[in-house]
Regions:
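Generic secretory/membrane-interface signal
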Residues: 6-8, 42-44, 230, 234
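C-terminal cap/substrate-recognition subdomain and adjoining C-terminal extension
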Residues: 118-151, 155-341
Length: 341
């Protein structure tokens, strides 16, 4: 049996372990005389996955190799079929994953996809990033009472993400997902599109993370537990533009990341570039990623851009901490104003 709680999915046998770290979501209540006047002290760091926390699409690490299918051929077919059928590209890739597996006589089930998450490669420093950010905030003067929550919003597969080493660090994961008991076939239960990602930013903002609840009802800004101004979105390209634009328009923040393989004119860029000579195709893709980040920055879609090096002391870490400093200062200003009545 598969149990659904908020945006995460898990089986009964691991429910106890996961429930201990599950985000507690409650509808905002009216303040009482005994409550603090200002309670919006939560900062939300929201991440894309493919290309942001991991160098490649998650399907390329285990699923496609298991089928003996080249990644470039699979994605080209997805694009071709989606255009020919006038279909959603994300539903198309989820359909083709099952179709290819069936052709090979392989069964696609939840347990196998979760296991594939163990093979997903992460950028340097990602595993230690969450702890380093927590330690930074705890040591930050004026950050008493401020907490940081990490969220994942991805068009990738929830099942594969659950198998990664970093799943435990997220307060909630909103990603595409299969429905495995639909006519005894895997069927897309939820698809997270580029523009659809913004729905989940509103869910975080309003504190309505249970996907069974509508977010369309009006909620006053004062009643929303995590203001957009307390959010930072991390993404790597065009698919993240709607999310970046939403946050920037509402006082929030965004950081664009690119492969550390890319070369830039920044003196610090060489620190993040790994040794060795990567294939020409990877270098070209990395340069295109850097170019896209520069375009996003020039267009005002992000506050900063940096190599996807998540180690403490990297450009990405330092620039994220600058935004945290700013948000903490804003929280303190609002808290002081609230105390004045």
């Amino acid at each position: 049996m598969v149990e659904r709680v908020s945006g995460k999915t898990h089986t009964d046998d691991d429910g106890a372990a996961r429930s201990s770290r599950r985000a507690t979501v409650a509808k905002p209540r009216a303040k009482t005389a005994t409550q603090d006047k200002f309670t919006k002290k939560t900062i939300a760091l929201v991440y894309d996955f493919d290309g942001t926390l991991s160098p490649k699409p998650m399907q390329e690490y285990a699923f496609l190799p298991k089928l003996g299918v080249k990644a470039e051929d699979f994605w080209a077919e997805c694009t071709r079929v989606a255009k020919a059928e006038r279909a959603d590209p994300l539903i198309t890739y989820m359909h083709l994953m099952y179709k290819k597996a069936k052709e090979k006589g392989l069964r696609v089930d939840r347990k196998d996809l979760v296991a594939q998450g163990r093979d997903v490669e992460l950028y340097q420093g990602v595993e230690s990033w969450f702890g380093e950010i927590e330690r930074y905030v705890k040591a930050l003067p004026g950050a008493k009472g401020v907490t940081v929550k990490h969220y994942l919003v991805s068009s990738g597969l929830t099942e594969i993400i659950e198998g990664t080493k970093i799943y435990k660090h997220f307060a909630n994961v909103f990603a595409s997902e299969y429905w495995f008991d639909a006519y005894e076939l895997p069927f897309p239960k939820r698809v997270i599109t580029d523009t659809g990602k913004t729905q989940y930013l509103f869910r975080i903002n309003k504190g309505i993370e249970d996907l069974g609840e509508s977010i369309n009802s009006h909620m006053d800004e004062d009643a929303r537990p995590i203001p957009f101004a307390n959010m930072v979105y991390f993404g790597d390209g065009e698919t993240d533009v709607p999310s970046m634009a939403l946050l920037k328009k509402n006082g929030g923040h965004a950081i664009a990341v690119h492969s550390p393989l890319a070369r830039s004119d920044s003196p610090s860029s060489s620190r993040a570039r790994p040794l060795g000579s990567p294939p020409a195709g990877e270098r070209a893709a990395a340069q295109n990623g850097l170019k896209k980040c520069m375009e996003l920055f020039a267009a005002g879609r992000c506050d900063f851009y940096a190599p996807a090096d998540y180690r403490k002391g990297s450009d990405l870490f330092k620039r994220t901490c600058l935004l945290i400093d700013r948000m903490v200062a804003d929280i303190r200003v609002q808290e002081e104003r609230s105390a004045l009545g």
